[in-house]
């Protein structure tokens, strides 16, 4: 079983929506995902035409430092495919895109409770930037 990373295509949106719901508990809206495909890089790994792993890269610009960077979100792998190199394969593709697009750094946020993910990020040479996230919600 080969592990191939590809960009999410319109024909795979329904599978991706099911994946997001299963992994993150969010019911993504098809029209929003279609917009995100045009705006961001959504990389997926499929098995039997089903999305089983994914990462989203949002290109941002740090105007004070005059640097482009990727903000990483929605990195996930279905439970039965974990610890088999899927997330590492996604990150290998991310590293290729970093070089191709003159990206200066990667950034992501991760909840304190996600210790397994933290080990993975540290293994990928991410450094912890001591920050707190503040959120204000509006109805």
Q: Which residue ranges define each predicted feature?
A:
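Conserved N-terminal entry element of GNAT/NAT acetyltransferase domains
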Residues: 1-11, 139
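Acetyl-CoA-dependent GNAT
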Residues: 7-67, 73
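Non-catalytic, surface-exposed connector residues within folded enzymatic/regulatory domains
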Residues: 65-69, 84, 128
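Conserved acetyl-CoA-binding loop-helix of GNAT-fold acetyltransferases
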Residues: 74-77, 83-96, 123
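Conserved GNAT acetyl-CoA-binding A-motif
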Residues: 91, 98-110
